[in-house]
Amino acid sequence: MDRDQQLIAFCQQAVQIPSPSGQEREVAQLMKRKMEEYGFDEVLIDRYGSVLGRMRGNRPGKTILLDGHIDHVDVIDAGEWSHDPFGGEIDQGRIYGRGTSDMKGSVTAMISAVAHFAEDTGRDFAGEICVSC
């Protein structure tokens, strides 16, 4: 599977997990698992359910933080949707579902981008890149 397909599948997995505010545990576990699979140096879920992953470069330097959220507005009108709010279906090149644009799509892209940057550079960068959600 190429990187684009991996990211699409990751986003679909995230969208398929309902995570209204205060109920993010399952999607947080997915983010943690993916960060670990991608080789993040440290991954933790804090007592509030937020996920933090660190990818360290080979040289000392500053830290950059990419931050997003993995909860979403509750679905109260599922019958009004043209696609299943938790289906993660692709239709005409678009992924449909609650959280695709706000903001599970962005979080999955950030995690993937950090992992691929580290891989492509052989971690030859200064500092560390953190992703939190």
Positions of predicted regions on the chain:
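Active-site metal-coordination/substrate-binding segment of hydrolases
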Residues: 62-130
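N-terminal helical capping/dimerization or prosegment-like subdomains
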Residues: 1-65, 69-76
